[in-house]
Amino acid sequence: MQRTKSPVKLSSQVKKKQRRSELQNSSPGQYDGTDLVISTGSTLLDLAISGGRFREGGIPAGILVEIFGPSGSGKTVLLCQIAGNVQKLGGRVMFHDPEARLNRQFSRMFGLVPEDIEYTIPDTVTEVFSSVRNWIPDKDEQDVPIYTIFADSLAALSTEMEIGEGDKMGMRRAKEFSEELRKTCRIITQRNVLMVCSNQIRQNLNAGPYGQKWKTPGGEAIGFYSSLRLRCSLVQKLKESRVVRGQKHERIIGIKTKVDIFKSSVWKPYREADLYILFDYGIDDIRANLRFLKTVLKTSVYRIGDLSLGKSIDEAIQAVETDHLEQVLKDEVITIWNEIEEKFTDQRKPRI
């Protein structure tokens, strides 16, 4: 790609403009309670979760989070990325893997070091939630910023009765989820522990013509006790073509998934964010941010402020990475997202 200015000048030019726009931003994200927030690896999803409480958004500590959706929609990717970000902050990670399929090489792609986590393969619902109640920090670990527990996925958990083939209808599992969550959720809040679980969806045969066509296994307790529920939906498969020895070949290199804030007591619900997940890379935040700016600003080229990055998404990504503009791009997205959200803030006189 032909560049008309040197990378250093381009970077400094955009950064100066970004500083001015930040100073002019009269309504940055407000927050209350905890100031400990974990990123999902996606700027847009972080903002959708709590952009009105924290400037950069993210998942606050001390809550239960459920990530659910159909198979292949990116649930495990999101789970591993959050766990990897916890490790980067120096936090402790306990990873329950009832499906027994965590790929260690795959997890390293997200910064998650398998050797440094407490890894278990539980069989029952009780095993998972009792570990939360019994996980008391050691005296020499008081400087650990956050303790986190992950479970992938809740749908794979059983009960002692079911294992002994005494639960023919499968009703005991829903009861155990309700009992265990009732005992565990207060401890999660008191100890400021973050618990993130993935779950599958099943067809709801009793939905009728107007009811919800799907449901999550394990009864209603998980959704009831979760402070944040994220639903992942596969939007499309990302394809690329390459020419090898004069022949054109096409491969699927990743997926685009939509994450809906299905329930939230963290901030406003019913926001959504698009995630681009590449098989050999993980969550492509640069791609998502560039497409967001191009869509909301309705420009013909990819750009950051006054800086044009070209019409090709691959060229634009390369320019951002070459000039080290990742943080500048992120700040631009946050500023514009806040400007849009501010227009939907109720300006009426407070009732109380």
Regions found by a protein language model. Name each.
Residues R108, M161-I163, A207-P209:
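Short acidic, glycine/serine/threonine-rich loops at helix termini
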Residues I117-D123:
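Short acidic-hydrophobic, aromatic-tinged amphipathic segments that line or gate anion-handling sites
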Residues M1-Q30, I38, V65, K237-I352:
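C-terminal regions of RecA-like/P-loop NTPase motor modules
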Residues L102, L157-S158, N204-L205:
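Catalytic P-loop NTPase motifs of RecA-like helicase/translocase cores
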